[in-house]
Design a protein with these regions (language model features):
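Interfacial helix-start motif at the membrane-water boundary
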Residues: 66-81
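Membrane-interface alpha-helices at helix entry/exit sites of multi-pass transporters
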Residues: 71, 164-165
Length: 314
């Protein structure tokens, strides 16, 4: 009788654990999609202007970059929400499942655990979002071009090839960014004073600053891969895009033509890799997205816990 009860309790415990994992996954998806939709709408004019400034080699503040700030956005709002959600969803899942295992069972360091979260979130995000990103950037290339017309044009001109261009550069960029971002924000936040009470305004502000700083530095680190990615996306569907090495080699050759050897090169790379406007966009955008995701995730988790207390599962 005792053994039967023990087996029954074990199965119930395993079932409860499975349900909690499934519920947390649903919460992460909902939080991520909400974050992605909000941030994609908020920052779409900035993103489009940044892309056009790199593609057309003109000033970011040029009016031409902002002439149609929401071109193609309404036709692809779901895709944009997905693009902005994947990193946060994978990050949330890794923190719930991978992080405790690495820290509690394997006894790894905090930095290594954050490194694993970053490389997981970055690689999955890069692989899942690249094709949609390629379509999005193609949509931005001309006026009156929609998401679905871009898909048709890309397929007509290059079959499936245009949808996979930029994949390696995207994964390299997102992995570099993810590892740098997760490690730095963890190190910075660990230096902040901790309060036993509920998180106050000052702590939220400091968290935002840490996330912004970490994202800014991660953007600079991953900047060369992002430049190569942009050059690959800017290649017409009927042509083969340059490799990461070729894109970076070309920009290095261009830098040799600068009048001042050191300062001229630094200014040139700053403009090409958009260290400034691009860095500010990712720093603020990532911090805003992280705050929205964390708050939404926390609220939904609390709501689920309250429902369990009110209507416990039998």
């Amino acid at each position: 009788m005792s053994n039967t009860r023990t087996i029954s309790d074990t199965k119930k415990s395993e079932l409860d654990s499975t349900l909690r994992i499934q519920q947390q996954f649903s919460i992460d998806i909902a939080s991520g999609l909400f974050t992605g939709a909000f941030c994609s709408g908020l920052f779409n004019p900035y993103d489009r202007a940044l892309y056009l400034s790199v593609k057309c080699t003109r000033s970011f503040l040029s009016w031409k970059n902002f002439s149609s700030p929401y071109q193609g956005f309404s036709q692809a709002v779901i895709q944009r929400a997905f693009l902005g959600s994947v990193y946060y969803i994978v990050q949330g899942e890794m923190k719930s499942n991978l992080y405790p295992y690495l820290r509690n069972h394997l006894g790894t360091s905090e930095s290594f655990a954050q490194f694993c979260i970053g490389i997981s979130a970055g690689s999955v995000s890069g692989i899942l979002t690249n094709s949609i990103s390629a379509i999005k950037y193609h949509t931005w290339g001309q006026e009156n071009r929609t998401f679905f017309s871009s898909v048709h044009e890309m397929w007509t001109l290059g079959s499936s090839r245009p949808f996979f261009k930029g994949t390696q550069a995207t994964v390299a960029r997102d992995v570099t960014f993810g590892c740098t971002y997760e490690i730095l924000r963890s190190l910075m936040r660990n230096q902040l004073p901790k309060s036993n009470d509920k998180k106050n305004y000052k702590e939220s502000y400091l968290d935002f600053v840490c996330n912004s700083a970490a994202a800014g530095l991660a953007t600079i680190t991953s900047g060369p891969f992002n430049y190569a990615r942009t050059m690959q996306y800017a290649t017409p569907p009927s042509e083969s895009p340059p490799t990461i090495w070729k894109a970076l080699k070309n920009v290095w050759q261009e830098s040799k033509n600068q009048p001042q050897k050191f300062l001229g090169k630094m200014r040139f790379f700053q403009q090409r890799f958009r260290v400034g406007w691009g860095t500010a966009r990712v720093a603020v955008g990532m911090a805003v997205g992280q705050e929205i995701f964390d708050v939404t995730r926390s609220k939904l988790t609390d709501l689920y816990s309250e429902q369990l207390k009110t209507h416990p599962k039998k």
